[in-house]
Amino acid sequence: MKLSCTLTQWALYVCPAVLLATQMLLAASSETLKCEGLVSTEQGSCQAAAEEDEGDEDDGDMTQSSEAGFQFKGYTFSKPFHLSVSYDWLILQGPATLIFEGDTLVLHCRAWQDWPLTQVIFYREGSALGPPGPKSEFSITMVQKSDGGHYHCSGIFRSPGPGSREAASPVAITVQELFAAPVLKALPSSEPQEGGSVTLSCQTKLALQRSASRLLFSFYKDGRSLSVRGVSSELKIPKASEEHSGSYWCEAVTEDRQISKQSPQLEIWVQALQKPTASETPPTEALGPLPPPPASSAEQPRFSSPDPHLHHQMQLLLKQIQDVRALLGHLVMELRDLSVYLKPGTTKVADK
């Protein structure tokens, strides 16, 4: 087994290194371990290595990082990995580094002493992934989280092999999440007052190992797009109105458009401004004393001229009064005549 690690220039410290190798080797086989990592001087661009979380103060010059391994006296060491040596006829070699959504997954079915194989079959969770064939390599171009599981392979050795089908031990393949499904939040509230401003924030984060990648964001309302994809994870509504009420969601996608995820819907309800009621109306100031009536000028007449219509009505009323008086006079005369006949003496004479 060979170990190669080449440094191109002298440096005071080394950036986080990655030791690449297959996780399982066949006994008596040859394998090269490659140490990959940028090398820079103290003024270089790899300052992140020195800024990792520090360990206990008692460790002196040693600091630890869950991602980069550890540092000692200014040097950064790769994170260790487990290497297995197998004496089986077949082994399935998986990737040495973490596999994320969107990556290409490559599996190798290797035989003892690299003897040629035929009728090779790859399996996932015990189910064949295809018919037998001569290829000892299986790949998934754009892996998803659902592609994780236990894989193994089987094949038949050509001469001088045993001639029977052999199977490799299962290997667990875990696909890491590149970024979580975004969550849409409304700031300061999902129930803003009419006329206020609202900021929609599409919140998610890339995995630390892929933090150099970028995500593009877009926003939607009631099935229609509100913005084109861009690097900004926020959408601002400067002046909210009742028309802005509805169901919103956002989408985060990688720059190569291979991985996209949507957020759950968020209901935005814009509260209309309430007009003040009579009880809420502020009291009016007390009115001062009324001004005195204006003094009449000498030119203004004291009485206005009578109304012609009123004069006509008065004439009719006087005429009716006179008619009533005449009628009353006739009634008085009639009553006098009747009183003569009603006297007692007059009645007796009339009876004789």
Curated annotation (Swiss-Prot):
Biased composition (Acidic residues): 50-61
Superkingdom, taxonomy of origin: Eukaryota
GO BP annotations listed: cell differentiation
SMART domains tied to this protein: IG (SM00409), IGc2 (SM00408)
Gene Ontology cellular-component terms listed: cytoplasm
Family annotation (PANTHER family): FC RECEPTOR-LIKE A, IMMUNOGLOBULIN FC RECEPTOR
Protein name in the entry: Fc receptor-like A
Organism this protein belongs to: Mus musculus
